Amino acid sequence: VDAKTLKLKKTIQNAGQWVTGLMWSEQTQRIYVANGGGEILILDPKRNRIEKRWKPLGDKPALLLNLAEDSATGRLFVTDNSKAKTTLVLDIHTGEIIKQLDVGDSLAVKFNAKRNELYITQRESGKLLSLDATTYAVKQTWDLPPNPNSLLLSADGQTLYVSVKQPSSREKEATAPDDVIRIAL
């Protein structure tokens, strides 16, 4: 999409099942795309084409959702909320698995370089986790029921904003508004 005119420039075909997450990497100058088929696609934004496809969990069922980057170490964090219920730590250049974080259901992920922390929302469990980004040990857990969802980090890395969704479905709409929680780190 042209950023000035908002007109469609090109459609990239064969992006897999359910494109779920996008992330721009300043380090690699590429766009990383997660999809419901368990793939990470690497896009060249100048040529508008898929350069690589990674399937980090192989043939295991995976619904890769959201992505975050540690540009200093070249790590790519990817959440999975399917049967694997994990967060993957990948080499951003090769797609090789560095570590699989078996923290349970994982939705949003955000890396905080200033504090060397990783934040993961667990929508089903109603929790937010803070992990040490070197050891991957859980440092803190916040109960944020019913469904913590998206994450936004302040520019100074000292405040985390979490959207908390209310339960809803096609059969039953939410009975209360969603919330945004501010956490001083």
Question: Which residue stretches match the model-derived regions?
Answer:
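Predominantly soluble domains enriched in secretory-pathway, periplasmic, or organellar proteins
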Residues: 1-185
